[in-house]
Amino acid sequence: MKLCGFDAGLDQPLFLIAGPCVIEGEQFAIDTAGQLKEMAGRLGLPFIYKSSYDKANRSSDQSFRGFGIDAGLTILDKVKKQVGVPVLTDVHTAEEAPLAASVVDVLQTPAFLCRQTDFIRAVAATGKPVNIKKGQFLAPGDMLNVVAKARHGAREAGFDGDTIMVCERGASFGYNNLVSDMRSLAIMRGTGCPVVYDATHSVQLPGGQGTSSGGQREFVPVLARAAVATGIAGIFMETHPDPCKALSDGPNAWPLPRLYDLLATLVELDRLVKSRPLAEQAL
């Protein structure tokens, strides 16, 4: 799959989607994007900057949601032009999709909305690459149906429907907890789409702090290494210069000053894993 000027897939080098959970300001976005671009460049790692203009599914209505679509897209457009990186953001309604698509390079659909047929079709109908997050409640094999909806929407709008990614972000494990089943990464290859692993939301403790979600960021490297060892196309990580001060999802964000070393490990591991055919593909 062609994605933002590079090839994405299990037979291609790992790519990175990373950035703060939510836009916290124009200069903040430009600075974090610049640091991430520099890290990725040193590692030869294809990179897409991620940040949200609105967090529509916060635990509490008192939590910071973001700058809103107009101001948020203006900031993302400046990041794209000034820093020189492709940008990704999530949309929450069908009506938002065309406006967001006019600015960003990749659209993302929230995990909670993966079963919403009209929404999935509308986002794919923009013709932009789409990163579809698998719901915490969904079996990995059920993503076949979600991808079929997206392709239907894209093809009805005159596009080929071949610019879709699927993203694992953990499965509900009792209350206020998630677990990652690495088999799901292999199962979702059956969609024919590049598989992305979200290493930070997978350590989230949904609603675990009462009015906000908790997280166990110490397990981000553990799960990221496991996913890359399984064999994936891309890794997704939310990062922040000081996660304890982040306005959204701080407990599961990986510290930006510690990111380079983790990425370096993942790049080396990815090269090793992809240097030979995956054994399971021979069965």
Curated annotation (Swiss-Prot):
Pathway assigned to this chain's UniProt record: Carbohydrate biosynthesis; 3-deoxy-D-manno-octulosonate biosynthesis; 3-deoxy-D-manno-octulosonate from D-ribulose 5-phosphate: step 2/3; Bacterial outer membrane biogenesis; lipopolysaccharide biosynthesis
Top-level EC class: transferase
GO biological processes: keto-3-deoxy-D-manno-octulosonic acid biosynthetic process
Keywords for this protein: Cytoplasm, Lipopolysaccharide biosynthesis, Transferase
Pfam families noted in UniProt: DAHP_synth_1 (PF00793)
EC number, UniProt record: 2.5.1.55
Recorded catalytic activity of this chain's protein: D-arabinose 5-phosphate + phosphoenolpyruvate + H2O = 3-deoxy-alpha-D-manno-2-octulosonate-8-phosphate + phosphate
Molecular function via GO: 3-deoxy-8-phosphooctulonate synthase activity
Cellular localization per UniProt: Cytoplasm
Protein name as it appears in the record: 2-dehydro-3-deoxyphosphooctonate aldolase
Gene Ontology cellular component list: cytoplasm
Gene for this chain: kdsA
Family: Belongs to the KdsA family.
Keyword Disulfide bond recorded: no
InterPro entries in alphabetical order: Aldolase_TIM, DAHP1/KDSA, KDO8P_synthase
Transmembrane segments: none
Source species of the chain: Laribacter hongkongensis (strain HLHK9)
